[in-house]
């Protein structure tokens, strides 16, 4: 059975009126989840492999996403705890499940306490095994993207989340 996740990403531009329209549109369209991102640029981790990407034999293995450019882009799109709580409630009112991508361990307990039952992990963090262990403890189902992950990292992630309900997604960033 297919699960439909509507990705709002940061397309709301920090505006809850836009986000509210997205939530209700997703619900009216029959989606199962509507998703935002819990991203706080001050928590981002520098990762060398994303500075220039990785190309092997003419094939791009890792996307190019330089740290400083990403930090600057995300800084103006930050949401706060009150907006996260509002989002969960708005989703419940609209009859759709809320979902968020968490990028740091520091937000895991906070988000679980706000009513998210399921969580998504970005492909950049599929190999962040401490993060996987943290979300495994606090959420019912894990959606884990694999698009920017090597096969051996995915195999290790399976070992880390063993016993937990999860779905792997192959989301491609372009």
Predicted feature descriptions by range:
Residues 1-174:
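Catalytic cores and adjacent flexible loops of soluble metabolic enzymes
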């Amino acid at each position: 059975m297919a699960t439909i996740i509507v990705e709002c990403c940061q397309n709301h531009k920090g505006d809850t009126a836009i986000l509210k329209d997205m939530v209700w549109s997703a619900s009216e369209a029959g989606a199962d989840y509507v998703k935002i991102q819990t991203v706080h640029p001050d928590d981002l981790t520098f990762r060398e492999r994303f500075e220039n990407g990785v190309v092997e034999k003419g094939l791009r293995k890792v996307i190019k996403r330089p740290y400083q450019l990403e930090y600057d882009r995300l800084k103006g799109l930050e949401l706060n705890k009150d907006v996260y709580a509002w989002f969960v409630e708005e989703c419940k009112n609209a009859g759709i499940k809320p979902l968020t991508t968490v990028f740091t361990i520091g937000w895991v307990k906070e988000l679980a306490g706000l009513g998210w039952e399921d969580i998504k992990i970005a492909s950049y963090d599929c190999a962040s095994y401490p993060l996987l262990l943290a979300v495994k403890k606090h959420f019912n189902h894990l959606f884990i993207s694999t698009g920017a992950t090597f096969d051996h990292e995915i195999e290790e992630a399976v070992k880390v989340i063993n016993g937990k309900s999860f779905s792997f997604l192959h989301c491609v960033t372009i």
